[in-house]
Amino acid sequence: MYRTHRQHSLLSSGGVPSFIGGLVVFVSAAFNAQAETWFDPAFFKDDPSMVADLSRFEKGQKITPGVYRVDIVLNQTIVDTRNVNFVEITPEKGIAACLTTESLDAMGVNTDAFPAFKQLDKQACAPLAEIIPDASVTFNVNKLRLEISVPQIAIKSNARGYVPPERWDEGINALLLGYSFSGANSIHSSADSDSGDSYFLNLNSGVNLGPWRLRNNSTWSRSSGQTAEWKNLSSYLQRAVIPLKGELTVGDDYTAGDFFDSVSFRGVQLASDDNMLPDSLKGFAPVVRGIAKSNAQITIKQNGYTIYQTYVSPGAFEISDIYSTSSSGDLLVEIKEADGSVNSYSVPFSSVPLLQRQGRIKYAVTLAKYRTNSNEQQESKFAQATLQWGGPWGTTWYGGGQYAEYYRAAMFGLGFNLGDFGAISFDVTQAKSTLADQSEHKGQSYRFLYAKTLNQLGTNFQLMGYRYSTSGFYTLSDTMYKHMDGYEFNDGDDEDTPMWSRYYNLFYTKRGKLQVNISQQLSEYGSFYLSGSQQTYWHTDQQDRLLQFGYNTQIKDLSLGISWNYSKSRGQPDADQVFALNFSLPLNLLLSRSNDSYTSKKNYAWMTSNTSIDNEGHTTQNLGLTETLLDDGNLSYSVQQGYNSEGKTANGSASMDYKGVFADARVGYNYSDNGSQQQLNYALSGSLVAHSQGITLGQSLGETNVLIAAPGAENTRVANSTGLKTDWRGYTVVPYATSYRENRIALDAASLKRNVDLENAVVNVVPTKGALVLAEFNAHAGARVLMKTSKQGISLRFGAIATLDGVQTNSGIIDDDGSLYMAGLPAKGTITVRWGEAPDQICHISYELTEQQINSAITRMDAICR
């Protein structure tokens, strides 16, 4: 039973007495009767005195007063799941849910439109049906749903996905530590080969205290031939400012890149937080695509910092789970192949046209010092302010300014919602700069952005944009360089191996930049995407170009993909081009349908094939097998074998991943060049959370997380997750919760021990950004007992209510032959039985169970009520 107020009916099989059917029949008839209903006690017992007071059923009441955990449904949409107090309004009206004006307002009822609500006390039960015409409240006992129907005119007008701030939860106080370690050890058979060992550790630590979030992000790395190095990527104190729909940050952060280029800073910033907006009003996140020619290490950097690192198999890859440290700023993607060669390219990351809903104001104010990880740049103080306003007729007006010792900039822009023709924005920036050689420059930059979705054709122009800058235009970052040209090395980089992607020359300022991102759905024929960018410079013909194309389709159970990647950076003599063909085929379709491993469990097996050809005609081919194991599908392995036409060498790899309760682990082995180069790679990630109820180990943390507290429900699976269970105390952390959104947290009741019952199997939470929200589950660990009750040798009265002393939420009803079923009973206790309100209509059952009885599926026993 998953409700706070428990009323256990009796089992009807295996010789166990059942709740008398006559009561159900007559109660149902009573609800449909037009005249006053009366139950004849003689129908239930020959002796009417042996029947409890049934007056509540005569009034059409299916429940007794008390607190019930119910789903609240407003106009056929679930808006909340919580405890609701059901009270007796009057003897004539009977029992109803007590809904206060405050709770109705939080659900989305426009109480301000009805003055009668304002006249009620905040904690008083509001007569909804009397105040709002045509409104009704119905309690579905069988489904534990409180169904509220209100005319649409009485509902607040909110955007799709809106959750009222009254439901936002700041979470509990806690210490947080997330870690991610990866390493690789190379073994070379050649005596003159160097070792290629590398290690990388990322630590995300923090403290939550009320609405405040203290965070630190640090990394440790070591590679062969280099000393180990710690880096402090960022440290900051942050909190939500809910009345302003914004966020206050003190410490290290990044400015938004909507107007000016995103820069890293150390200081103070107050800015709007789009996470507080409904999903329908939010933008998009970057997706990084590419093609690896071998088992490769993928490193993604933003603003000079490594924000993502992983290992991929040969073929096309797509990374969509990047947690960027900034809302903007191009991403530098480095693909390090098994032979040590590195291919790099830049992926533009910008916002779609800067439109806001009418009346909305989006703001950001920053007072800080410029922060850099480059040895070529200096740090100086600057100020920045931006503002957007959603005007009438689908317009958005925006502007901003930057001020520093050697830099002044102001920009102004206007966006239009063109309806069926999409959305556009246009802005101009005027800047005055003083460079490293003390030369002064003035210039302008013009930008145009366009976005459109053609629903009829399935085409989505996620982003099309063009920026043109005059030769005298520079950015704030340009004025921070100590020299006019050079190679931009970050702390810890190998300065003996400069890369063109890190070369800068302030004489060659940016001129024009074109970028496009288009996707097209082809119905049952699949889909394709096209993305690209081109950056030109003043005083040179050199350009940066990136073009990516892909097509994916499904032919029955066969998944087929074709992709092409072209990239060229200025100074790079030749472009890098790679064409790839890949497919995957599920193998479990070939296995018996009756095989439990592939029907009732989360186990899958599939074969993959990847073929790629570069611009020099070199071909790589790989064939692989992947399978998931264990009941929860949290163990997987992958085996691949490949061939490279360049040098006619063979390569292969094998890896295994385990997603556990306390951590995620991975180990892999790969070889190339016919075995002359071999590498062992491994990774371990997880978290540690210290809170008022103890210390909990878990999987990797997200930005926002949920702590499950279910004492008594140890080793219970978390629904809709992989490898996630409660620990030996009944606690676990559910990572990657969505801030300011409804998060449904559920335990899998089927995985409970047989002597454990849950009052609530589902908890809905709405965390604020960075919060650790507590989701409490009330578990009753105890015996399931079927008692044959009596008092002075006579069975207890039919319909009497029995309640476990000290646990008012654990109750049951006496059956027609005096039987009582209750679950979650401790080894020893007292049960109070009532069959009326008079002082003599009560008795008590004292019981004591053996260990064998506690562990039994159901214990049958006689019980005397005194």
From Swiss-Prot:
GO molecular function list: fimbrial usher porin activity
Protein's cellular compartments: Cell outer membrane
Protein's GO biological process: pilus assembly
Entry function: Part of the elfADCG fimbrial operon, which could be required for adherence to host epithelial cells. Could be involved in the export and assembly of the ElfA fimbrial subunits across the outer membrane.
PANTHER family for the chain: FIMBRIAL USHER DOMAIN-CONTAINING PROTEIN YDET-RELATED, OUTER MEMBRANE USHER PROTEIN
Membrane topology: Multi-pass membrane protein
SUPFAM superfamilies, per database record: FimD N-terminal domain-like (SSF141729)
InterPro entries associated with the record: Fimb_usher (IPR000015), Fimbrial_membr_usher_CS (IPR018030), FimD_plug_dom (IPR042186), PapC-like_C (IPR025949), PapC-like_C_sf (IPR043142), PapC_N (IPR025885), PapC_N_sf (IPR037224)
GO cellular component terms, semicolon-separated: cell outer membrane
Gene3D superfamilies tied to this protein: 2.60.40.2070, 2.60.40.3110, 3.10.20.410, Outer membrane usher protein FimD, plug domain
Superkingdom in the source lineage: Bacteria
Family: Belongs to the fimbrial export usher family.
Gene (UniProt): elfC
Keyword tags: Cell outer membrane, Fimbrium biogenesis, Membrane, Signal, Transmembrane, Transmembrane beta strand, Transport
Record protein name field: Probable outer membrane usher protein ElfC
Triggers of expression: Induced in the presence of epithelial cells.
N-terminal signal peptide: 1-35
Keyword Membrane applies: yes
Main location: membrane
